[in-house]
Amino acid sequence: MSRVSNSDNYSLAGQQHTVLGSGRTSSLLWTSNPGSHFRSETRGNGRENGQDRVKRPMNAFMVWSRDHRRKVALENPQLQNSEISKRLGCQWKMLTEAEKLPFFEEAQRLRAMHQEKYPDYKYRPRRKAKMPQKSDKPLPQTPLLHCAGRRTYTSTSGCPFLIHGRLFLRATQSQTGGAVKPFAAGATAISALQQELSQQHRTLRCHSGNVGYADIRRRSLSL
């Protein structure tokens, strides 16, 4: 049961528990002042820090739709609440300024009463929880090589290396321990490239098609 502080003007006259659609309990607190009958709502999950949540005063449209919503719901029981709101919105727009005037005056009167009862009231809209954004970028399947080059080719074994670049670097798996052994630039890298080509039948699968061993060797020596 919610705790309500004792006051000279207000006291807890009754408390009624209801269950909301989301499964949370809601307490309806009514004051002893027969002239106000103001209803405040508290959530059972403690989000309001145990304090009563003061509802905003009704505007002109809410005052007008208070009775019309009930009428439309009785005439069309199959309609959802959102559809009823759309119909009421269209009907409200079709009214003339003279027809809307009494409801604006009533809304102004309710706003003045609300401000008199709750002078420190400030509207605090509830913020929606932000969902974490999922990244659509796929994870790299091959080891990343930080090299200065223009083209990247992939051999039949799946190991990438660079052609037409200043450095020839390649990551290979050791057959004994499985550790990655980097090759230095220059002649050592060219020798490693030749061994790779001979082991893979001197063919490579490139982005533009198959490139033979002689073509790769000619490009390497031209640097």
Swiss-Prot record:
Residues 23-55 are annotated as: Disordered. Its main location: nucleus. GO terms for biological process: cell differentiation; male sex determination; positive regulation of gene expression; positive regulation of transcription by RNA polymerase II; sex differentiation. It comes from the Eukaryota. Residues 38-55 have a biased composition (Basic and acidic residues). Residues 23-35 have a biased composition (Polar residues). Acetylation of Lys-130 contributes to its nuclear localization and enhances its interaction with KPNB1. Deacetylated by HDAC3. Pfam families: HMG_box. GO terms for cellular component: cytoplasm; nuclear speck; nucleus. GO terms for molecular function: calmodulin binding; DNA-binding transcription activator activity, RNA polymerase II-specific; RNA polymerase II cis-regulatory region sequence-specific DNA binding. Keywords: Acetylation, Activator, Calmodulin-binding, Cytoplasm, Differentiation, DNA-binding, Nucleus, Repressor, Sexual differentiation, Transcription, Transcription regulation. Residues 54-122 bind DNA. It is found in: Nucleus speckle; Cytoplasm; Nucleus. Transcriptional regulator that controls a genetic switch in male development. It is necessary and sufficient for initiating male sex determination by directing the development of supporting cell precursors (pre-Sertoli cells) as Sertoli rather than granulosa cells. Involved in different aspects of gene regulation including promoter activation or repression. Binds to the DNA consensus sequence 5'-[AT]AACAA[AT]-3'. SRY HMG box recognizes DNA by partial intercalation in the minor groove and promotes DNA bending. Also involved in pre-mRNA splicing. Belongs to the SRY family. Interacts with CALM, EP300, HDAC3, KPNB1, ZNF208 isoform KRAB-O, PARP1, SLC9A3R2 and WT1. The interaction with EP300 modulates its DNA-binding activity. The interaction with KPNB1 is sensitive to dissociation by Ran in the GTP-bound form. Interaction with PARP1 impaired its DNA-binding activity. This is Sex-determining region Y protein. It comes from Equus caballus. The lineage of its organism: Eukaryota, Metazoa, Chordata, Craniata, Vertebrata.
